[in-house]
């Protein structure tokens, strides 16, 4: 193997300051500033709706739908209803849903985490709710920065999240396999699930 080919293969990990050793990459590369070095969703952590830090490695071996949510959007009812339905029918098959409240689009998620949790309970939400975050800009959560630049996570007109209820399908290895725009209802994802569950 030529030196130039070897360098091209190792360049991403050398820029992080470490070779990608399983386990080590997650602790070294998935910090707030080093999200570009992550190889899977499992290298990130996020606060749940109750304020507890969750290591997303707990989703290893599960297929996940990751979505930004809002309680005052015109798409709220259909998305919450269909996400609850998907979770009820596929959780036993290995589907997990991670919902991240976000107030960046029309200020349609203005409440506190406690208020958002109470709102979601009205839909009988059993899937995992996380603390309110930003999904765009410098303050975007590192997971969302990472998902948007993955080969299958890129958007149609730029990578920025366009609105509430943008959804990412994540495989069992923590890799983005598809991005769904805010106009695509959760039931659209169902046809893709058998390939990954």
Curated annotation (Swiss-Prot):
InterPro entries registered for this protein in UniProt: Glutathione_peroxidase, GPX_AS, GPX_CS, Thioredoxin-like_sf
Record field: catalytic activity: a hydroperoxy polyunsaturated fatty acid + 2 glutathione = a hydroxy polyunsaturated fatty acid + glutathione disulfide + H2O; 2 glutathione + H2O2 = glutathione disulfide + 2 H2O; tert-butyl hydroperoxide + 2 glutathione = tert-butanol + glutathione disulfide + H2O; cumene hydroperoxide + 2 glutathione = 2-phenylpropan-2-ol + glutathione disulfide + H2O
Entry keyword Transit peptide: yes
Active site: 73
EC number: 1.11.1.12, 1.11.1.9
Keywords associated with the record: Cytoplasm, Developmental protein, Lipid metabolism, Mitochondrion, Oxidoreductase, Peroxidase, Phosphoprotein, Selenocysteine, Transit peptide
Positions where Phosphoserine occurs in the chain: 40
Any one GO biological process: arachidonate metabolic process
UniProt xrefs under Gene3D superfamilies: Glutaredoxin
Annotated Pfam families: GSHPx (PF00255)
GO MF terms held by the record: glutathione peroxidase activity; phospholipid-hydroperoxide glutathione peroxidase activity
Domain of life of the organism encoding this protein: Eukaryota
GO cellular component: cytosol; mitochondrion; nucleus
Subunit structure of this chain's protein: Monomer. Has a tendency to form higher mass oligomers. Interacts with FUNDC1; this interaction promotes GPX4 recruitment into mitochondria through TOM/TIM complex where it is degraded by mitophagy.
Similarity-based family: Belongs to the glutathione peroxidase family.
Described function: Essential antioxidant peroxidase that directly reduces phospholipid hydroperoxide even if they are incorporated in membranes and lipoproteins. Can also reduce fatty acid hydroperoxide, cholesterol hydroperoxide and thymine hydroperoxide. Plays a key role in protecting cells from oxidative damage by preventing membrane lipid peroxidation. Required to prevent cells from ferroptosis, a non-apoptotic cell death resulting from an iron-dependent accumulation of lipid reactive oxygen species.
Protein name as annotated: Phospholipid hydroperoxide glutathione peroxidase
Species this chain originates from: Sus scrofa (Pig)
Gene name linked to the record: GPX4
């Amino acid at each position: 193997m030529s030196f130039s080919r070897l360098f091209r293969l190792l360049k991403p990990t050398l820029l992080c300051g470490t070779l990608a050793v399983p386990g080590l990459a997650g602790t070294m590369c998935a910090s707030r500033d080093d999200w570009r070095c992550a190889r899977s969703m499992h290298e990130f952590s996020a606060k749940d709706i109750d304020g507890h830090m969750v290591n997303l490695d707990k989703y290893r071996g599960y297929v996940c739908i990751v979505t930004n949510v809002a309680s005052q959007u015109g798409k709220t009812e259909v998305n919450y209803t269909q996400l609850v339905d998907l979770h009820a029918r596929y959780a036993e098959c290995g589907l997990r849903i991670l919902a991240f409240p976000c107030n960046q689009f029309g200020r349609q998620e203005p409440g506190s985490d406690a208020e958002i949790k109470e709102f979601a309970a009205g839909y009988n939400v059993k899937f995992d709710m996380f603390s309110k975050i930003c999904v765009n800009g410098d303050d975007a959560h590192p997971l969302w920065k990472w998902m948007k630049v993955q080969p299958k996570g890129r958007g149609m007109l730029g990578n920025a999240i366009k609105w509430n209820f943008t959804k990412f399908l994540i495989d069992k290895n923590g890799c983005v396999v598809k991005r769904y725009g805010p106009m695509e209802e959760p039931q659209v994802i169902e046809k893709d699930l058998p390939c990954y569950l």
